[in-house]
Amino acid sequence: MDARSPDLTTDAAGWRTDVPTTKSLAEVNASVALPTAGVWWRRLLAFVGPGYLVSVGYMDPGNWATDLAGGSKFGYTLLSVILLSNLMAILLQSLAARLGIVTDRDLAQACRATYSPAVNFLLWLACEAAIIACDLAEVIGTAIALKLLFGIPLIGGALIAALDAFLLLLLMNRGFRFLEAFVIALLAVIAVCFAVQIVAAAPPVAEVLHGFMPKSEIFTNPEMLYIAIGIIGATVMPHNLYLHSSIVQTRAYERNETGRREAIKWATTDSTIALMLALFINAAILVVAAATFHKSGHSDVAEIGQAFELLSPLLGLGIASTLFAIALLASGLNSTVTATLAGQIVMEGFLDLRLPSWARRLLTRGIAIIPVIIVTAIYGERGTADLLVFSQVVLSMQLPFAVIPLVRFVSDRRKMGKFAISPYVAAIAWIVAGVIVVLNLKLLADTLLG
């Protein structure tokens, strides 16, 4: 999988000499100015944004389905799995940010400058499949939200979802900071919606805190283990690693050792705080499911539409179901923005092929909408639930192809110099990568074998 073949020459850092260096997302690269002086929090605020764009992928409809299933069936027990998967995500996203800041390459560009053309083409195909699978989940989530809120049939909602292809174009024309503000505002809407539902559900605090402690029964109960693997598989998104390694470069930090060191510090802080928000939202979905469905004996709630119908009656709060659907719609809109960006980064990085963002969006979403319309027409809403699970399986299959190159690059002192991660951190990263790969392979095998 290396570029170490007779016909491919590399420089001292191990990058292929026949691959030109281009800026990642050139139209917004280094476009966000940083304060040259002042108190530390002003520097931090200037870096706030990329982490929140990344966090969007950690609360898409695939996460909702696994969190609902875990909470309704097993109460608060699987909160520890959500915490563990979030800690894994924090580590991997910090490594992605480090790679982008130090090498001035996103993960796709780093792969292209290291591996042979054949390997890069296969990696690109795998990543495109993952992005389309992610888009599939967004189409389903948006269509379900539109049906729950406005009574629009699922097929109509899926077609309406195609129109958001122009949302990113509109936001990018206003500047990258405007796009970040839009995403953060929708994340705030999601957080408020679930905060209200948690207050209404009034879960016992002691039981919730106890749920964050790992339990041996997670490994001894096959059904619980299956859902736990699903939670981890739905949490760590491969396209987020490509996305984060690129968008951290939108900051105009000094491209020298001092500037890069400070950028790594603030970018890691930004993504860690943002992913803690994702932890809250994922935990909130599970807690609401546990306090509402599990407590009342509804232990088989795994579908979003089913949860919507039961929430208000069980909570005794008329607006609860509406808040749930609003949060789902906000999640779908946010995921649209980040998946489009990730698609652009991957296509430009691996192939050096540049398409207008609206054309890129229409292509990806057009491919994703076809199976949604066919399955909905034949099998109805139940079919979309199965399709949602399938999209998570496809994402799981691609994950190793993003995680392994990332850990390998940031461990390489030739490529990273002084910024290469320590052997201790590298060991943890490889363990995390190994755990994710093994768990996702098990999830894939269990799903295919029924």
Curated annotation (Swiss-Prot):
This is Divalent metal cation transporter MntH. The chain crosses the membrane at residues 44-64, 77-97, 121-141, 152-172, 181-201, 218-238, 273-293, 310-330, 366-386, 387-407, 419-439. One of its GO terms (cellular component) is plasma membrane. It is a multi-pass membrane protein. Disulfide bonds: none annotated. Pfam families: Nramp (PF01566). One of its GO terms (molecular function) is metal ion binding. Its main location: membrane. One of its GO terms (biological process) is cellular response to iron ion.
